[in-house]
A protein has these predicted regions:
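Short, Lys/Arg-enriched N-terminal segments with co-localized hydrophobic residues
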Residues: 1-13
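N-terminal glycine-rich anion-binding loop in soluble enzyme alpha/beta folds
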Residues: 18-79, 84
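Small/polar loops that bind or transfer phosphate-bearing groups
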Residues: 23, 103-104
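Anion (oxyanion) recognition and catalysis
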Residues: 33, 93, 120
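N-terminal glycine-rich "phosphate-gripper" loop used for MgATP/nucleotide binding
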Residues: 79-86, 104-110
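Short, charged beta->alpha transition segments
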Residues: 81-92, 115-118
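Glycine-rich phosphate-binding loop signature in dinucleotide/nucleotide-binding domains
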Residues: 91-99
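Short Gly/Thr/Asp-enriched flexible loops that form oxyanion-binding sites at enzyme active sites
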Residues: 104-122
Length: 123
């Protein structure tokens, strides 16, 4: 599940919590759906364009992405921001569920900090 596409009725009726992560989780879209994870996408900057890093490759195909990399184009990422985490958290909390958030390393990205700020703001 991608942030923003979750409605309260889809929020895991048999669990008291939802596991949230970001798109650096190194899971396939199929795995994330099977595990019922809420996934917040980071942004990939490549060849002058910004793309959400969606696990299903729908924003930029894996073939296009790796083709550009092989062609020498530099790719960088931008952390998920507080608003993206709040958007993902809102329907989960509205359904009365707790959130366990497992994010990209705070030593490498501000994604973890964004998740923490969003959680504090949503209390």
């Amino acid at each position: 599940m991608i942030a923003g596409n979750i409605t309260p009725k889809e929020v895991y009726p048999m669990r008291e919590y939802v596991i949230m992560t970001d798109s650096c989780c190194d899971l396939t879209d199929h795995m994330a759906k099977e595990l019922e994870l809420a996934v917040v996408p980071l942004t990939v900057h490549i060849d002058g364009h910004d793309y959400p890093n969606l696990l299903d490759g729908s924003a930029i195909s894996f073939e296009d992405f790796y083709g550009k990399i092989r062609g020498g184009v530099l790719a960088t990422t931008a952390a998920a921001n507080v608003g993206q985490f709040q958007e993902a958290m809102r329907p989960i909390l509205a359904a009365g569920k707790d959130i366990v958030s497992i994010n990209f390393s705070s030593a490498l990205s501000t994604t973890y900090q964004s998740a923490c700020i969003a959680a504090q703001d949503m209390k």
